[in-house]
């Protein structure tokens, strides 16, 4: 098996922005959820959101790109810049065909598209912007990153709801193992326009609470759903583990195989548990080797119970530390799991387990939840999970760098 290394990070999340060395760690125990500021949420079920403060696109991107792109694409471009700089990648040293991009998104550039349609239909603007033809598209982030950095190798986009970020990392890993030297990957979602969240509203998963510290309570008997978050989890370059030291790059860790099960009812017991077991088997890792689990944290009883049962089924009740740092950011949709991966690798380097905040855990779940503050732990292996609407279940093993 060819090891695949994570060599850089560019984080754009409600509680962190930039390279890992430029700010506080993404597990800093604070809530980033607050009332939506980029639109009036009063007519929508979810009143709160995790928004990214302080990002000014003009400080990071050429002026010509700003009017052509949605805000999430600008975040994607900036995060890719940060990740490549963090990895010490000089793109000029690579053949363009040796570099690719894989991202995930389920909504695309919704704010740009919605603004243009409102101008056309409600404000008398006679035509749409020419940039509408691509700015709204869910694949635009892969395209714009590849254009900006001249990356002409294998590329793509993954659409699998909340599981998309892990699926994008897995696809990038496959491409590296097949011979592409460098793949930039990650996931991004908008939360800055009503249309971005509206498709999720009928599913009933979002919290209607207006209390930031009580709105998103996974594994809590008072859980009312999740708080949506906007932004990009992380854009890590992936490359062969042996190639990174050869060019003097620092390795954050290794991305292991991913198990992805799209069928919600496979006839093989718990689909989530089966995804976890498959990821462990493919990584050559025993359940006892996993020292922390980053939970998906749906925030409602049926989802939380199913996830807790799957974790206990594989690892044993209360046998492995479990955390859900998404309680500090909201669920970033497909961007959430890549942020978990970044958080896991940085936390393993720091010798801690990030906390779950605000919750009063329900004893029924029988989980060893890491609560309120970081827990010191010299651990080297973690598992992340994600579940999307329609039964997408993904699990990924990550290991600390040597």
Curated annotation (Swiss-Prot):
Q: Which species is this UniProt entry from?
A: Streptomyces virginiae (Streptomyces cinnamonensis)
Q: Where is the composition biased (Low complexity)?
A: 192-205
Record pathway: Antifungal biosynthesis; monensin biosynthesis
How is this protein named in the record? Putative polyketide beta-ketoacyl synthase 2
List the EC numbers from the record.
Answer: 2.3.1.-
Q: Which UniProt keywords apply?
A: Acyltransferase, Antibiotic biosynthesis, Transferase
GO biological-process terms attached to the record: antibiotic biosynthetic process; fatty acid biosynthetic process
One Pfam short name: Ketoacyl-synt_C
- Family named by the database record: Belongs to the thiolase-like superfamily. Beta-ketoacyl-ACP synthases family.
Entry-linked Gene3D superfamilies: 3.40.47.10
| CDD domains associated with the record | CLF (cd00832)
Q: What else is known?
A: This putative ketoacyl synthase lacks the active site cysteine.
| Record domain Ketosynthase family 3 (KS3): where | 1-400
Q: Does the keyword Signal apply?
A: no
């Amino acid at each position: 098996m060819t090891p695949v290394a994570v060599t850089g990070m560019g984080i754009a999340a409600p509680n962190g922005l930039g390279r890992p060395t430029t700010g506080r760690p993404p597990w800093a125990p604070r809530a980033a959820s607050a009332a939506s500021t980029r639109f009036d949420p009063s007519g929508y079920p979810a009143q709160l959101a995790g928004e990214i403060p302080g990002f000014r696109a003009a400080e990071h991107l050429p002026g010509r790109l700003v009017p052509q792109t949605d805000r999430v694409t600008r975040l994607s471009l900036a995060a890719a810049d940060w990740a490549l700089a963090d990895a010490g990648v000089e793109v000029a040293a690579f053949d363009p065909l040796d570099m690719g991009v894989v991202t995930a998104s389920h909504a695309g550039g919704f704010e740009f598209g919605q603004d243009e349609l409102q101008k056309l239909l409600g404000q008398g603007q006679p035509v749409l912007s020419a940039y509408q033809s691509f700015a709204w598209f869910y694949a635009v982030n892969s395209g714009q990153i590849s254009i900006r950095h001249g990356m002409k190798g294998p590329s793509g986009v993954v659409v699998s709801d909340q599981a998309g970020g892990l699926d994008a990392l897995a696809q990038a890993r496959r491409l590296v193992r097949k011979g592409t030297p460098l793949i930039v990957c990650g996931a991004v979602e908008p939360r800055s326009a009503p249309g971005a969240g509206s498709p999720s509203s009928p599913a009933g998963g979002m919290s209607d609470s207006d209390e930031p510290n009580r709105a998103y309570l996974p594994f809590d008997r008072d859980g009312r759903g999740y708080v949506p978050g906007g932004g990009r989890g992380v854009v890590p370059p992936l490359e062969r583990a042996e190639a990174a030291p050869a060019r003097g790059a620092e390795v954050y860790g290794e991305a292991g195989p991913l198990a992805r099960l799209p069928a919600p009812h496979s006839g093989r017991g718990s689909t989530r548990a089966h995804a976890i077991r498959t990821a462990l088997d493919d990584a050559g890792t025993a359940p006892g080797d996993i020292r922390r689990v980053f939970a998906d944290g749906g925030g409602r009883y049926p989802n939380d119970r199913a996830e807790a049962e799957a974790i206990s089924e594989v690892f044993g009740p209360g046998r492995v530390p479990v955390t859900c740092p998404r309680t500090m950011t909201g669920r970033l949709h497909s961007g959430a799991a890549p942020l978990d991966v970044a958080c896991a690798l940085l936390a393993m380097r720091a010798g801690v387990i990030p906390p779950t905040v605000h919750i009063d855990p329900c004893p029924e779940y029988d989980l060893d939840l890491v609560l309120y503050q970081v827990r010191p732990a010299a651990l080297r292996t973690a598992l992340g999970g994600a579940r999307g609407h329609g039964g997408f279940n993904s699990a990924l093993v990550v290991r600390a760098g040597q």
